């Protein structure tokens, strides 16, 4: 979708991150810091100031990384956050769109709802969807993905 709209794509590869981070604040912070460092090494080569618009698209712990990188580097960016973890809201700002499933074991829906309300962020909640935005019903999941991509495209187009 982003490429179709003329965005240049810079994919960030995190490398190896700690395992079994869910429920372990120390490991989660370690994973975040490592992912942020990997991102910094790759993204610092980009001259963001030459672009009319910067769009970060992220998922899971990557939502915290994208928000923190943009904030730390004073990049005026728009953000698409797919299934943020609870810790992401420590750095997520007021510019973006959020997608969350009510069966996501990484963060309670009420937390996501409250944090999005505080920031006036559009939030799209999918009932019974997990951290991968899947419900276990393939046909339903395809429809869910189609809806998510429609909302994503609408956000990209609303410059």
Locate the predicted segments by residue.
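A conserved short beta-strand
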Residues: 73-86, 94-95
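Short beta-strand/loop motif that positions the catalytic acidic residue
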Residues: 98-100, 104, 112
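Acidic catalytic loop of the alpha/beta-hydrolase fold
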Residues: 102-107, 131-132
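Catalytic histidine-centered segment of alpha/beta-hydrolase-like enzymes
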Residues: 22, 129-144
């Amino acid at each position: 979708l982003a490429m179709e709209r003329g965005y240049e794509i810079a994919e960030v590869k995190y490398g190896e991150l700690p395992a079994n981070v869910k429920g372990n604040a120390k490991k989660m912070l370690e994973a975040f810091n490592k992912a942020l460092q990997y991102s910094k090494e790759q993204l610092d080569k980009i001259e963001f100031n030459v672009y009319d618009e910067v769009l970060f698209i992220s998922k899971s712990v990557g939502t915290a990384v994208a928000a923190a990188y943009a904030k730390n580097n004073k990049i005026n960016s728009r953000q698409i956050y797919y299934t943020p973890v609870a810790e992401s809201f420590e750095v997520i700002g007021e510019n973006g769109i959020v997608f969350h499933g009510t069966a996501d074991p990484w963060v309670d829906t009420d937390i996501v709802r409250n944090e999005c309300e505080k920031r006036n962020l559009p939030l799209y909640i999918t009932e019974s969807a997990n951290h991968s935005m899947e419900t276990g019903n393939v046909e339903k999941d395809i429809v869910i993905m189609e809806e998510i991509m429609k909302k994503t495209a609408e956000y990209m187009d609303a410059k």
